[in-house]
């Protein structure tokens, strides 16, 4: 089964949105296989956002991600990367569909509540940055037989 990385950013944690976000993914039928609340160290933030290192917004992004706790999650399911990206919505909340997480809970691209891996390759890389092998749990949800053919 596929896995992806999702992070509720400091604004989402501070606004009390973690439970709502987890509930949405669970209600969809995705399986939570890892989760933790952390203040991210600079090295992991830099590694997480390495493609943005040379961009002018990176210093602000780094400061923002390090400004408070983040809720880190590993989710599992068929086609989970694409499913989660649709549920999260467009990066710019002004363009996010109503009903998506960003469409419902974010107003500003610089405070857009949540990060989700954008490809299976990114998911594998990001999961490796934030979770050690033993931190992800393999188990079966009781409803899996009715979720998948």
UniProtKB/Swiss-Prot annotation:
It is an enzyme of class 2 (transferase). It comes from the Archaea. Its EC number is 2.7.4.6. Its cofactor is Mg(2+). It is found in: Cytoplasm. Keywords: ATP-binding, Cytoplasm, Kinase, Magnesium, Metal-binding, Nucleotide metabolism, Nucleotide-binding, Phosphoprotein, Transferase. ATP binds at residues 9, 57, 85, 91, 102, 112. One of its GO terms (biological process) is CTP biosynthetic process. One of its GO terms (molecular function) is ATP binding. SUPFAM superfamilies: Nucleoside diphosphate kinase, NDK. InterPro entries: NDK-like_dom (IPR034907), NDK-like_dom_sf (IPR036850), Nucleoside_diP_kinase (IPR001564), Nucleoside_diP_kinase_AS (IPR023005). GO terms for cellular component: cytoplasm. Pfam families: NDK. It catalyses: a 2'-deoxyribonucleoside 5'-diphosphate + ATP = a 2'-deoxyribonucleoside 5'-triphosphate + ADP; a ribonucleoside 5'-diphosphate + ATP = a ribonucleoside 5'-triphosphate + ADP. Major role in the synthesis of nucleoside triphosphates other than ATP. The ATP gamma phosphate is transferred to the NDP beta phosphate via a ping-pong mechanism, using a phosphorylated active-site intermediate. NCBIfam families: PRK00668.1. PANTHER family: NUCLEOSIDE DIPHOSPHATE KINASE. Belongs to the NDK family. This is Nucleoside diphosphate kinase.
């Amino acid at each position: 089964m596929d896995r992806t990385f999702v992070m509720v950013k400091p604004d989402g944690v501070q606004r009390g949105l973690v439970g709502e976000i987890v509930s949405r993914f669970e209600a969809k039928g995705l399986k939570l296989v890892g989760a933790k609340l952390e203040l991210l160290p600079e090295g992991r933030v830099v590694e997480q956002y390495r493609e943005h290192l040379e961009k002018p917004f990176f210093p602000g992004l780094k400061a923002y991600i390090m400004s408070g706790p983040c809720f880190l999650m590993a989710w599992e399911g068929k086609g989970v990367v694409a499913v989660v990206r649709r549920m999260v919505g467009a990066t710019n909340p002004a363009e996010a569909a109503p009903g998506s997480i960003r469409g419902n809970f974010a107003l500003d691209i610089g405070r857009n509540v949540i990060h989700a891996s954008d490809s299976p390759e990114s998911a594998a890389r990001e999961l490796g940055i934030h979770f050690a092998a033993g931190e992800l749990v393999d188990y079966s949800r009781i409803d899996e037989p009715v979720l998948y053919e």
